């Protein structure tokens, strides 16, 4: 039942809502601050998440003062290349939804096609339903969601999983939020082929590629967490490494940076182990030199 003009007028005149106080109660700012600290760059993504959080908060305040409106669509699409923070942002989004009482538990369940689709008749439905059962009350994050749909194979069971997801998205919106993720071009085709699903996804967040300088900062942050550091020369060499690696196949942004760091640590350990003097300082153990990076195959091709 909607609010009459008279009732709305009374609400406007006599109901005061302290927006800052309500915002502080939710502790959403803590989540947004964590997002800023944990993720380098990605300003458009952070702004979009803040916009979604603002919509959800205002919707809750409207309900509080008796204003009627349909619930905002909560299902989302995260598009962008791998290693750009989609899973991290999904975790924070789950926390925001929980703090605003849109979901009951606030946990994140991450899956791919293999977790949902069976290999024979009658196998897909129980697999998908089991995943949904685990995710209820939280957020289900489906990575590389486009692999659910294989139009060139009429016997593929992915379409069965999609049908079950559609039913849950429509009928259990209060119990579960689904985030579909993957490369933008492939996700666009996926939605075009599944208009029923696309119409139920209200929030789209595009994750851009990192710039080389941002990836260097990510590397330094990863190293700092492990109590390592790069020399100034090593910083320049690592930046050069990133630029070269970005031109190679299967580049995965922060994931590729993490892999490069792991290999640099291995070379660093071998260099330390092979020192003529077996007495090493704390600085020796924590400092990665340019040579630890220059031994990469990228510099030898």
Curated annotation (Swiss-Prot):
SUPFAM superfamilies in the record: P-loop containing nucleoside triphosphate hydrolases
Keyword annotations of the record: ATP-binding, Chloroplast, Nucleotide-binding, Plastid
InterPro entries given in the database record: AAA+_ATPase, AAA_lid_6, ATPase_AAA_core, CbxX/CfqX_mono, CbxX/CfxQ, CbxX/CfxQ_RuBisCO_ESX, P-loop_NTPase
Pfam families linked: AAA, AAA_lid_6
GO MF terms, alphabetically ordered: ATP binding; ATP hydrolysis activity
Gene Ontology cellular component terms for the protein in this record: chloroplast
Keyword Membrane: no
Binding, ATP: 80-87
Keyword Nucleotide-binding: yes
Localization annotation: Plastid, Chloroplast
Function of the protein: Necessary for the expression of RuBisCO.
Family: Belongs to the CbxX/CfxQ family.
PANTHER family according to UniProt: AAA-TYPE ATPASE FAMILY PROTEIN / ANKYRIN REPEAT FAMILY PROTEIN, AAA-TYPE ATPASE FAMILY PROTEIN _ ANKYRIN REPEAT FAMILY PROTEIN
Protein name: Protein CfxQ homolog
Organism (species): Cyanidium caldarium
This protein's encoding gene: cfxQ
